[in-house]
Swiss-Prot record:
Family of this protein: Belongs to the G-protein coupled receptor 2 family.
The protein's name in its UniProt record: G-protein coupled receptor seb-2
Organism: Caenorhabditis elegans
Functional description taken from the UniProt entry: Not known. Putative receptor.
Xref: Pfam families: 7tm_2, HRM
Amino acid sequence: MNPSISTAGAVVDDFQMSCRFSNFGDHAPESFDSLSCGACFYFIFMLVEHYKDRYVASLCEDTFGVLVCPVDVSDKICNCYNREYVYNIPEFALNSSRIKPLNHLRLDPPLPFQFDLIVKDCCSAARYCCRNTLVKYHHRVDDSPCPPTWDGWNCFDSATPGVVFKQCPNYIYGGSNIKTDYDRLSQKVCRSNGWATPEVNAAAREHTDYTGCMSNGDVEARILAGLLTYSASVIFLIPAVFLLTLLRPIRCQPMFILHRHLLISCLLYGAFYLITVSLFVVNDAPLSSQVFQNHLFCRLLFSIQLRYLRLTNFTWMLAEAVYLWRLLHTAQHSEGETLRSYKVICWGVPGVITVVYIFVRSLNDDVGMCWIENSTVAWIEWMIITPSLLAMGVNLLLLGLIVYILVKKLRCDPHLERIQYRKAVRGALMLIPVFGVQQLLTIYRFRNVCLIYRLLHKSFCRRMCSEILVITSGEAGSRS
């Protein structure tokens, strides 16, 4: 944190009513509000790589706000006296006539949706710290070597020598829908002569260690788990699809046509996951810059993977359940049935829903990083969630009906009751991954610690589904 601002002129005459800002001196509460709010935006967004290289940004010495200019703008124009380039949130600014509202700022790539509300959370925390911690310090007897201070993100009360820990606030992650999944902590060291500076440079500025707030290890573990599990899933699914396509005795049977399309849907989802992660997400990915630009190409690819192919998974699972229930309920089927209506509905309806989703989101929430995250406008995301939940609910109902029909049919021989129930239970367990009922276990958004389990669970269920269908295919082929 090193924006240029003089601390000597920042010290207020009435020291009894001042708020301390680490490295920036003591300020009157109103001046503190303005300076700390500009600093909140600066520290959250303008130190990020893709903005740091494209824009000149610094805190204005008059504490009115933060100066933000494209790198190609002349210094004669880019200065704190030019209102066109000075931004702050009006309700926190010392003089709102000298700044432009922060929500008027437009950067390339775009800032997150409602970024000004994220900054406002930080500004409010700074104001609360000033009024409730920093000012009160001057009205009490306190011999602590480290005075209370606002460091730009967190509020620290006076401290004795040692390490002070503070929970990482959500706003430092720069996204309104990002929440810390467990308690990460920043730390600030208090020494006998005051708050510590980095050991390597005794003349350095006051320092808070926020490395404990970083989640890079979690992200890397999740990416690695995803790559490994979906690679295994694709490896298992490819031979399964080939077997269902090439085995003559079964390739034209309606039930196995459904199996084949379900596995193709799962295969495409896994393949697209590997493609998108390799192109956009991993370190040194060739198209990673498109994520920050919210490029149309990456939005399209992620929409196909995360919306269209996910919906096709659910529609083909539903098709499996509907066809099996119809088969058991009516005891009629045609060996030459092409299932054209199933194909049109299961591949077509998700396509229509996805196209509508893309159109609606582009009008109402056309921000974010390639739409990897859910839309911040909740009702838009329910366009995908509702049909998925509906498909799972119907599948759960049909699973119960199918088990009931199986038990009823198996009771024809009263002497084999234990075997009958064993067969019914085994049949029901085999149908769970085929119908996708296990997806109900992952509706809850797991903590980061459990996301690896979630990836393993999804991939395992796809692999188990392919194994079950291949085994049943082999049995059917051997009987034909």
